């Protein structure tokens, strides 16, 4: 619980058999998590059994892709505050406290992995990933007149229940570039949001998305294409985010 609000953590898994059990246990150990929901997205053999050894609830999403799994998690989670994270050991469960602190004033809290002092030795944050994520984030800032953003690829984030429902209803991207879509849906909904630094650790195992520079570059290009298309269909009146629950464009 965070105050009087229930906290759900959603973990989407595909290739995290070696780490998922310890990550689930780590989130419960924080003392603020009421539910850990694991979305099994056609995960490697043995993953489901690892999850069953924990108190986590597991659901199965057959449509392959980060976007499909995230949407399922947002729909299935029962909490008032919903935290998305990776079960690969790259994020510290303890950092959930940072996100929760800002949930008292914000509808969305996005993590950023671009603070050098919090990037651990061996973490997969080479210069092209760090600066690439930064550049795409600045593109969103410029096109959507937003608050400060520095990392579109960070998947450690928090949404309120109302905002999670709105995002799940409007999501269209099923693949690995769904992260910026969720961010853009939050921005254009009028949600109040903030970005905060989180720790970034070496991954346990190999990533199917960013383990290869070529794949990471391809995902980045898909993100840029998505952002440009999203901007083209967004009315100018929606480029000054307002408080969630008010008419877009009214401001605070």
Where are these regions (language model features)?
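Hydrophobic helical membrane-anchoring modules
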Residues: 1-4, 18, 146, 170-252
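Cell-envelope/extracellular polymer assembly enzymes that use nucleotide-activated donors
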Residues: 6-8, 35, 181
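Short, well-formed alpha-helical segments that are part of the catalytic scaffolds
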Residues: 14-29
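Donor nucleotide-sugar binding loop of glycosyltransferases
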Residues: 16-19, 43, 66
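A conserved acidic beta->alpha catalytic loop
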Residues: 40-48
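Acidic donor-binding/catalytic loop of UDP-sugar-dependent glycosyltransferases
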Residues: 46, 85-102
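Acceptor/aglycone-binding surface of glycosyltransferases and processive sugar-polymer synthases
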Residues: 62-64, 68-76, 94-172, 203-213, ...
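Short aromatic/hydrophobic "clamp" motif used to bind/position activated sugar donors
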Residues: 82
